[in-house]
Amino acid sequence: MPILSNDYKPPFLFKYRHINTIYSSLFRKTKPVFFKRKRIETLDDDFLDIDFIENSSKKIVILCHGLEGSSDSKYIQATAKLLSLNGYSVAAMNYRFCSGEINRQLVTYHSGKTDDLHAVINYVLPNYESIYLVGFSLGGNLVLKYNGDSLFSLSSKIKANVAISVPVDLKGSSIALRRSENTLYSWRFLRTLSKKMHLKHHQFPKNFDIRQLKKVKTLTDFDDYFTSKINGFEDAEDYYLKASSKQFIPNISKPTLLINALDDPFLSESCFPVREANESSNFYLMTPLHGGHVGFISKGDFYWSEYQILNFLDRN
């Protein structure tokens, strides 16, 4: 039942999915956001740097960025700005090794690492009456998985969730990213991920074989040799199987909106959970014809998807 219609119509040039995706990431200009950084210590003696916009509101939105993003990502900054202007406090996560400083432990972030999201929720829990989770791409997978996988008891203070451009089937998305038209995206990810692995190897020289980087040609290769092994999975296949959020969507009990553009170059057909939305009373799906990956460009300071986030949170 909750498959929602949408009114997204991009400016003419941005009907091309790669332009919508690339412009949003590389060329968008956003108004300054003044965050206050706080460091959270984790149970395994590591840390998370969280950037806050705090006001008198008793409502807070936790923002979860995508692969190799941070609180500096344009979509995080714009969403934080819009939400704060409309009465919400904001906590923008920086995952492990994403705040500009290497984390202490061998483990890093990944698409299924919901324990770190849980730590941030517990940190803000005493000070707010209503908590909302918003995730983009990998961060959206975290939000959906956290709400559906029953590893953690969900606080009654969590009121609603929004996820944007989410590879809910990680294996399907990894195959889509291997298409030749997506080479630029994969190259950009692998460039920064490889640099991080060199720093990790300097920190933990006996824990993995850095020479495997020479074999890495795709993100799947990287996940096979590094992401999976460092974070306790057998291989990329095991990681994708266990961390994909699609399998957990039927268990979601809070109002949750997923917006995936039909022309998203990162997504396979399996990343559009139509059946799950049809069978759910809490999970809402929007599939605009255009939008690219975390694009949804529109005129003005804020993008169409950011207004959808605000509208959904306001209603819940």
List each language-model region with its residue ranges.
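N-terminal cap/lid segment of alpha/beta-hydrolase-fold proteins
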Residues: 14-55, 297-300
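Short beta-strand element of the alpha/beta-hydrolase
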Residues: 58-66
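The serine-hydrolase catalytic nucleophile loop
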Residues: 69-81, 269-270, 299
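Conserved alpha/beta-hydrolase
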Residues: 72, 80-104
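Catalytic nucleophile-loop/oxyanion-hole region of alpha/beta-hydrolase
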Residues: 96-132
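Alpha/beta-hydrolase-fold enzymes
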Residues: 132-230
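Short beta-strand/loop motif that positions the catalytic acidic residue
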Residues: 252, 258-260, 264
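Catalytic histidine-centered segment of alpha/beta-hydrolase-like enzymes
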Residues: 291-304
